[in-house]
């Protein structure tokens, strides 16, 4: 079985056109971390530049500034690396081109493998990978396996830091480099192999039974986020649902989990 972990950093913003409002991500760094059992891990790192036109930048100026300072520590006007990939000047075309390049690399990495598990940790890359429909691949969000955040992992597991590396593109000391994050998540996956690989082995609980289980847990548990009717609680509610299944040893595939989220309007 081939395991593939993907992480994408870039500038996410709102794009307004004749089709309405669209949330898109213009990539700046992409890391694809992949390995098989009893083999050394391999890493593919891609850098991008361009792709943010003046209108897109102006509309999302405040959001881009926040992302630069607090998330990935890239700047819009930084000089591209010698091996950086130039994106089209039109933002929508840049978005499509970035996705296409990632798809092509994933196809190349996964070809000739009969069993593939594509892993991601939240983020838009999960939707991208699902839309690619890679042959023989199952897509799994690590959040749905109750994998802690990278920040929590490095606080609880100091040995994760000593053996994890980053790249010089980010402010030193930042834990938001995709290379660093993939190394940390790889450590967690190694320690939780049975949970991760179990995704491919266990049959999923049917939708109707999964809903009944969650309804039962809502009625039985005293402290849960569904007691607060607020959109701000949506992510906590999604995490709580996923945690209930994992803690009780119940496997629910991504399609059924998404249907449950939709049932409770957790968009």
From Swiss-Prot:
Residues forming coiled coils: none
Subunit comment: Interacts with host RNF135.
Protein family (similarity comment): Belongs to the asfivirus I267L family.
Induction note: Expressed in the early phase of the viral replicative cycle.
Keywords: Early protein, Host-virus interaction, Inhibition of host innate immune response by virus, Inhibition of host RIG-I by virus, Inhibition of host RLR pathway by virus, Viral immunoevasion
Domain of life: Viruses
The protein, known as: Protein I267L
Native organism: African swine fever virus (strain Badajoz 1971 Vero-adapted) (Ba71V)
Its biological purpose: Plays a role in the inhibition of host RNA Pol-III-RIGI-mediated innate antiviral response. Mechanistically, interacts with host E3 ubiquitin ligase RNF135, disrupting RNF135-RIGI interaction and impairing RNF135-mediated 'Lys-63'-polyubiquitination and activation of RIGI.
GO biological-process terms attached to the record: symbiont-mediated suppression of host cytoplasmic pattern recognition receptor signaling pathway via inhibition of RIG-I activity
């Amino acid at each position: 079985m081939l395991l593939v972990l993907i992480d994408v950093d870039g500038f996410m913003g709102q794009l307004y056109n004749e089709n309405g409002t669209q949330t898109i991500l213009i990539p700046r760094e992409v890391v694809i971390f992949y390995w098989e059992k009893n083999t050394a891990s391999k890493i593919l790192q891609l850098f991008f530049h361009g792709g943010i036109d003046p209108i897109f930048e102006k509309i999302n100026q405040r959001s881009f500034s926040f992302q630069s300072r607090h998330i990935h520590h890239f700047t819009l006007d930084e000089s591209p690396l010698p091996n950086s990939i130039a994106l089209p000047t039109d933002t929508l075309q840049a978005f499509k081109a970035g996705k296409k390049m990632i798809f092509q690399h994933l196809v190349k990495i996964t070809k000739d493998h009969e069993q593939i598990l594509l892993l991601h940790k939240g983020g838009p890359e999960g939707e991208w990978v699902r839309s690619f429909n890679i042959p023989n691949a199952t897509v799994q969000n690590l959040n749905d396996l109750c994998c802690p955040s990278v920040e929590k992992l490095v606080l609880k597991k100091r040995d994760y830091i000593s053996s994890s590396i980053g790249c010089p593109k980010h402010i030193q000391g930042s834990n938001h480099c995709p290379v660093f994050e993939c190394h940390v998540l790889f450590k967690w996956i190694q320690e939780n192999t049975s949970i991760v690989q179990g995704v491919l082995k266990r049959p999923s609980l049917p939708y109707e039974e999964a809903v009944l289980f969650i309804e039962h847990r809502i009625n039985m548990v005293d402290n849960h986020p569904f007691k607060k009717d607020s959109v701000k609680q949506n992510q906590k509610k999604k995490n709580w649902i996923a945690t209930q299944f994992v803690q009780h040893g119940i496997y629910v595939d991504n399609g059924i989990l998404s249907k449950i989220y939709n049932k409770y309007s957790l968009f």
